[in-house]
A protein has these predicted regions:
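C-terminal motif of bacterial Sec signal peptides marking the signal peptidase cleavage site
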Residues: 12-14
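Extracellular/lumenal and peripheral-membrane lipid-interaction modules
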Residues: 16-458
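Sec-dependent signal peptide recognition
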Residues: 1-7
Length: 458
């Protein structure tokens, strides 16, 4: 009878649900970690075919000139050019243009001003011509245009006439006069004055819009299909020297940007800004992002429950069954985990543990222990739960492989990096590395420092 009376209190305790007051959690987020500046290098291709056609159309197709004098040789000329076919070299344009000219001349050996203050020829003038009433005389012209990009993201050009070759000389036999040098002097002068026109037209080619499109696209959030939104937050830009693809008639330049990217599950308004003044180009490659990922505690709750829900811990004829886990928040950068359990006892208790990310990308809760309230209640209701084997089992199981999630995220980002951004604007890229390097706890979630690297192309 005494033995039965002795067991009654234990029996009554075993029927009760263990109820423990919730711990106090942090209500203020800690200062955010200062991350290294992220680098993004985006090769940009700008199609010049239609724009160079516009340049060609805008340049004069012909010009005329004359030089009249009473005594000696007077002449008038007309020059007509064929269409310009731009040849793109590595860092410049070179183009040879076929042209043709006609020349009308007259010659007076001696003038006097007796009857005319402008002078009059003492004998009848001798007239001659080249390319008039016959095929016009041929000439080959060549220009070279060096191209760079200004701090304002515009073409800056310097065009020079490099070739002027008269293929059909103009020799006037009637008065033994070789007009070739005179033609060269006059027409060449006109062609040299054309250098500035060529510069103006090429500099009017709009490359700023293409570069601004890159900047604007990086200001837009990238939807990671269920994993949140990636905000690049570009801060500065510099451009590589421009080069040209001769086959496809396009300009190629690499935009080198610095950024402060982050990932969040909550959409934030995009912040737009004008193109910044160009920074110094450092010749980087690909992209290397240090991203602050804002992840809610629910995301880890799902992973923990998937691995630990239903987990059984037997001990000396008793058993604890983990029904579910829930992260409440943190205390001094230690997670507070609410554990609902059943088995020999039923109820809840709270654990505290320090999270860390291992080099092989596992989320690990280390130094798991009961919080103070749990210790106090369990000492009175279920002292046997203090056995170190229970915490050892929980510590051993509190390790979660992030690699499947990271690989899935990597594939999602890769898909987003290979998509159409706008009409005629396509983004392509790869993700070579995605890894979490550190973790910090906030009031409602984690701040994960994530390193992402790969290549981009527009």
């Amino acid at each position: 009878m005494k033995y039965i009376l002795f067991l009654l209190p234990l029996f009554s305790w075993s029927c009760k649900t263990i109820d423990i007051p919730e711990p106090i959690v942090e209500l203020v987020d800690p200062p955010m970690p200062i991350l290294p500046v992220s680098q993004i290098n985006v090769p940009i291709e700008i199609d010049l075919q239609s724009q160079l056609k516009d340049v060609e159309k805008s340049l004069p197709k012909s010009f005329e000139g004359k030089q009249e004098q009473c005594e000696g040789v007077s002449f008038a000329y007309k020059f007509i050019r064929e269409p310009i076919h731009f040849q793109l070299k590595k860092t410049s344009f070179y183009y040879e243009v076929d042209g043709k000219f006609e020349l009308k001349l007259n010659y007076c050996p001696k003038c006097h001003s007796l009857w005319d203050e402008n002078g009059s020829c003492t004998v009848p003038r001798i007239y001659a011509s080249c390319g008039v009433g016959e095929p016009m005389r041929r000439v080959k012209v060549g220009y070279n245009t060096n191209v760079s990009i200004t701090d304002s993201y515009l073409f800056n050009t310097e065009t020079k006439l490099q070739l002027f070759d008269v293929l059909d000389p103009c020799e006037i036999t009637v008065f033994k006069y070789d007009a070739t040098s005179q033609v060269e002097k006059q027409v060449k002068g006109q062609l040299q004055s054309l250098e500035k026109d060529i510069d103006r037209q090429i500099e009017s080619v709009d490359i700023r819009s293409s570069i601004k499109d890159v900047w604007r696209q990086l200001e837009e959030p990238m939807d990671l299909s269920g994993y949140g939104l990636l905000y690049f937050k570009p801060k500065s830009m510099s451009l590589s020297p421009v080069t040209f693809d001769a086959v496809n008639k396009r300009a190629e330049v690499t935009a080198e940007l610095t950024a402060e990217p982050f990932i969040t599950t909550n959409r934030e308004p995009a912040v737009y800004s004008d193109l910044p003044k160009q920074a110094k180009y450092t010749k980087g490659q690909g992209y290397a992002l240090n991203i602050l990922v804002k992840a809610s505690y629910d995301s880890i709750n799902k992973i923990m429950n998937k691995d630990l829900m239903g987990y059984k811990i037997p001990f000396n004829g008793k058993e604890i069954v983990v029904d579910s886990l829930h992260i409440l928040g943190n205390q001094e950068q230690k997670l507070i985990i609410q554990v609902y359990f059943s088995g020999s006892k039923k109820g809840e208790f709270f654990l505290v543990g320090t999270p860390l990310i291992t080099d092989d990308q596992f989320f690990v809760l280390t130094n798991l222990a009961y919080d103070l309230n749990s210790k106090s209640v369990l000492l009175k209701t279920a002292k046997w739960m203090f056995d170190k084997r229970i915490l050892e089992e929980l510590n051993k199981s509190a390790k979660y492989d992030l690699n499947p999630l990271l690989n899935e995220t990597k594939n999602t980002i890769t898909q987003q990096l290979n998509s159409k951004l706008d009409d005629g604007v396509f983004l392509s890229g790869t993700v070579d590395r995605l890894a979490v390097s550190s973790i910090q706890l906030g009031t409602s979630g984690f701040f994960l420092t994530t390193e992402v690297s790969g290549n981009l192309k527009l």
